[in-house]
Regions:
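Phosphate/NTP-binding elements of NTP-utilizing enzymes
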Residues: 2-5, 10-185
Length: 185
């Protein structure tokens, strides 16, 4: 599979960036595919749309197997992280990968780029190890080399939401990390 195409140019509605976060957070139709298309002006492949639709359901568990460079991190995981922190105040997104380099060098820079595109950076703080949004939601990342780091994350905030992303799961050889993720709630 090849990488999803992204239209060149400014995001839709970019002239009115300041109100985007609250408009999105209030929107009852704010699903991940709609978010990617409306706010990031992305054209996604059907398989990416299907994955994002599956992630719309609370308590969903989605496993994705796709080719290298197909957009798993940049077009699926990053969209899910950004959508989640905007849509669910005070919520938490936990991101891990077999090596932290995947989170640090692939996911966070993509998030930073999307945040700039979406808001010009307003309302977000993107650091080397995480993302904070003005509504209190946050995303954190760590290496899956130690299963104990996956322990103890819980749903939080008004929305009672937790999103856990295991990127490049094929590089995680210890099943304990997956058992730890299953116990998080």
């Amino acid at each position: 599979m090849t990488k999803a195409k992204k239209k060149a140019g400014r995001p839709k509605g970019s002239k009115n960036r300041k109100g985007k976060e609250s408009e999105l957070a209030r929107s009852k139709r704010s699903d991940l595919h709609w978010f990617a298309k409306t706010y990031l002006d992305m054209d996604l492949y059907p398989w990416q749309v299907d994955v994002l639709k599956e992630l719309n359901y609370k308590e969903s568990r989605v496993a994705l197997k796709a080719a290298n460079g197909s957009g798993k991190t940049s077009m699926v995981a990053a969209i899910a992280v950004l959508w989640h922190v905007i849509s669910f105040p005070d919520s938490l997104v936990v991101c891990t990968a077999g090596v932290y380099r995947q989170v640090e060098a692939a996911l966070w820079p993509t998030l930073k780029r999307y945040v700039q595109q979406l808001t010009g950076g307003e309302g977000f703080e993107v650091t080397q190890s995480g993302l904070r949004f003005v509504n209190g939601a946050r995303a954190i990342g760590f290496s899956a080399s130690d299963p104990h780091k996956a322990e103890g994350w819980h749903r939080q905030g008004e929305s009672n939401n937790l999103l856990f992303i295991v990127d490049e799961a094929k590089g995680i050889h210890d099943d304990e990390i997956f058992h730890a993720v299953e116990r998080c709630q």
